[in-house]
Amino acid sequence: MEFLVDMVTTVPEGTSSETVEDTKRREAARTKELTAQGHLLRLWKPPEAPGEWRTFGLFNATDEDELRQVLASMPLHEWMTVTVTPFTPHPSDPGIGRPAG
């Protein structure tokens, strides 16, 4: 099942720049792992307001419980506000039956 995840990250006031950079490095590494595992399909950066740190992700998981576990494994998760929208295939989806890639 696919899910659109809106992730807004807010770094707690007083967090050192070293902690932020380390967490971002670990997040990038975890993103690669989730991609290799087939959980993370796409990422997008929408236009942001000043000071906003926002990402949209397309994730694949068996169900919402598994998705929540996947999201909790991301190093930035404790700083994120997450909104999840589950997707089901549309009968007119041009991608149905088309080979991936």
Question: Positions of the model-derived regions?
Answer:
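Conserved, structured core segments of small domains
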Residues: 1-101
